[in-house]
């Protein structure tokens, strides 16, 4: 199975399945001498882990990360960092009824078409459980970016169903179970989630992630444009069906005179481009959005077939998120951090001696 690695100089390779013994990853390219402990990684893992609120899956995994290699006496050595998280709350019996049935909207059908077999227990490798290791690896990148470059990466929920959320207060994001930055909409989200749980249904969501303090010059045209790599990273997250950079699809309705980010001696006057021009960071905030589909793991009966081609009706049992977008916030932050870390190392490798007299803001 290919496709388990992302990055060129900062490389993250993950392994493991939803109901296997453990999840793990190898992180290559971390510079030596960076203070690093398991506690540095645990904060973001706790933000992502299941069972932390009544609105997410009640699978209770502590997600305690272990550093197996690459750190000596509290600092990175420059060698591969091995990370491991044990699975402790699997209930594989919940999935015995779907051993021969393809859940509609899931990867069951496509995995079996590709490999000739599948791990039906919680989706196996296709499960969002895999993203725990992305968050752990991303926490390393976030620490390096913050301490060495002053880069801050933040994410939040900006829409659930037909409820749009304004970014009014970043400090509020960590104070409610929805990662919601809009104090006026929390009650509406709560009401929607309670209704969905009662109906046994689910809902889609939009997540926004923002990086501040990113220097100008990151990105490798033409095929490794910074926005292309960000889109690739975010699209690789489970349930993501669309990614926008900056104003995204809204630019369709704009004229060139409206969309261009004009520049004065005081800097850029707008940021429709989301901080990236020509595939290279401009020094402005990098802004990306991603749309997540409603999970298909619901108790509303649906039609499908089994592996023998027979039509059946099924209800998905188990412990699932009514809105997968909620726990996707720290995952999006991690993936953006991984991409920025990789591009910073690539920029330093090729263009460390480049100096310009062009203004920077």
From Swiss-Prot:
Family, per entry: Belongs to the chorismate synthase family.
Enzyme class: lyase
Function: This reaction introduces a second double bond into the aromatic ring system.
EC number(s) given by UniProt: 4.2.3.5
Name of protein: Chorismate synthase
Keywords linked to the UniProt accession: Amino-acid biosynthesis, Aromatic amino acid biosynthesis, FAD, Flavoprotein, FMN, Lyase, NADP
Gene Ontology terms: cellular component: cytosol
């Amino acid at each position: 199975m290919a496709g388990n690695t992302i990055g060129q100089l900062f490389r993250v390779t993950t392994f493991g399945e939803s109901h296997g013994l453990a999840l793990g990853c190898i992180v290559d390219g971390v510079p030596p001498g960076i203070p690093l402990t398991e506690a540095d990684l645990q904060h973001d893992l706790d933000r992502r882990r299941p069972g932390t609120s009544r609105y997410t899956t009640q699978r209770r995994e502590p997600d305690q990360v272990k550093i197996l290699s690459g750190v000596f006496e509290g600092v990175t050595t420059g060698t591969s960092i091995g990370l491991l998280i044990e699975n402790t709350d699997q209930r594989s019996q919940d999935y015995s009824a779907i051993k021969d049935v393809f859940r509609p909207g899931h990867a069951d059908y496509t995995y079996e078409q590709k490999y000739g077999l599948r791990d039906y227990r919680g989706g196996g490798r296709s499960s969002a459980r895999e993203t725990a290791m992305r968050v752990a690896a991303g926490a390393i990148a976030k620490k390096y970016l913050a301490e060495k470059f002053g880069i801050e990466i933040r994410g939040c929920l900006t829409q659930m169903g037909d409820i749009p959320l304004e970014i009014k207060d970043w400090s509020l994001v960590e104070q409610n179970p929805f990662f919601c930055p809009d104090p006026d909409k929390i009650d509406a989200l709560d009401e929607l989630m309670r209704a969905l749980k009662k109906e046994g249904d689910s809902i889609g969501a939009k997540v926004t992630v923002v990086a501040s303090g990113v220097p100008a010059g990151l990105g490798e045209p033409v095929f490794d444009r910074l926005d292309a790599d960000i889109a690739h990273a975010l699209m690789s997250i489970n349930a993501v069906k669309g990614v926008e950079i900056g104003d995204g699809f809204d630019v369709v309705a704009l004229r060139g005179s409206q969309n261009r980010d004009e520049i004065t001696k005081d800097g850029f006057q707008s940021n429709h481009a989301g901080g990236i021009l020509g595939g290279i960071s401009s020094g402005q905030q990098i802004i990306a959005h991603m749309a997540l589909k409603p999970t298909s793991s619901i108790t509303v009966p649906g039609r499908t077939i089994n592996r023998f081609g027979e039509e059946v009706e099924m209800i998905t049992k188990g412990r699932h998120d009514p809105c997968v977008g909620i726990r996707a916030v720290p995952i999006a932050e991690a993936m953006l951090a991984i991409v920025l870390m990789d591009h910073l190392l690539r920029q330093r490798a090729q263009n460390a001696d480049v100096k310009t007299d062009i203004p920077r803001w």
